[in-house]
A protein has these predicted regions:
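Alpha-helical multi-pass membrane helix bundles of inner-membrane/thylakoid proteins
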Residues: 1-4, 75, 87-126, 172-186, ...
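Juxtamembrane transmembrane-helix termini in multi-pass membrane transport proteins
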Residues: 2-75, 130-151
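Hydrophobic/aromatic residues within the transmembrane alpha-helices of Major Facilitator Superfamily
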Residues: 16, 20, 53-54, 90, ...
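Membrane helix-loop-helix hairpins that form the core translocation module of multi-pass transporters
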Residues: 42-110, 166-169, 196
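Hydrophobic alpha-helical transmembrane segments in multi-pass integral membrane proteins
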Residues: 56-60, 119-130, 189-202
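Transmembrane alpha-helical segments of integral membrane proteins
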Residues: 157-172
Length: 202
């Protein structure tokens, strides 16, 4: 397997920008870190990391070509995913802070839920298709898909952990129920805002 070093470095820079900048996954992980802590968010992190790497692999092995051949499918997925993200944004914004005098019935997102979410994550699809098409020549097929999926797994894990840690670090600052509610509303608004650049992609 021969790897193009110039494309490899370019892909690393692309991955840093795409994985670590705010998007639906990162905003939800930040919110979960504040509301549930690092340990309880681990299944959510793992679902995002493995779910997206799997999506990269499947896209590279042929699913991306289906969307290229039938662009209407990508359009349908884009708006269906946007509708689901709006639902999640409302759920986060309206979530009540924990009541210290009652059992906390809230639950963080599960591994399966986070993994399945990748398939309706609009930014995720833009990243997956862009990654596979722009950096297809990083190595010969199918090694190019393996390299991209492996790097996505690595960067996804680092990005997910860093955003959850940011959320947990805010626990000492966002203590009162009013502050938690304001934070959740802000995260819901940011989640909606993250849809704007993706929905305006041609």
């Amino acid at each position: 397997m021969e790897i193009s070093h110039s494309l490899f470095i370019a892909f690393l820079l692309f991955a840093v920008v795409m994985f670590f900048t705010p998007g639906p996954n990162n905003i939800m992980l930040l919110s979960s870190g504040l509301n549930f802590g690092f340990r309880r968010t681990i299944p959510h992190m793992a679902g995002v990391t493995f779910g997206f790497a799997f999506m990269i692999a499947v896209t590279g092995l042929g699913l991306g070509a289906v969307f290229t051949t039938y662009p209407v499918l990508q359009t349908v997925l884009k708006y269906a995913g946007a509708a689901y993200l709006l639902y999640l944004a409302a759920a986060i914004a309206l979530s009540a802070p924990p009541d210290p005098d009652a059992a906390d019935r809230r639950r963080p997102m599960t591994f399966l839920g986070a993994a399945l979410f990748q398939w309706v994550n609009v930014k995720g699809w833009v990243m997956a298709i862009g990654t596979i098409t722009a950096y297809a020549a990083i190595a010969s097929y199918p090694w190019n898909v393996a390299v991209q999926a492996a790097l996505s797994l690595l960067f996804g894990a680092a990005s997910s952990a860093s955003w959850v840690l940011c959320g947990t670090s805010l626990q000492s600052l966002v203590k009162s129920p009013r502050a938690v509610r304001a934070f959740n509303i802000a995260m819901g608004v940011l989640l909606v805002a993250s849809l704007y650049p993706v929905l305006h992609e041609p």
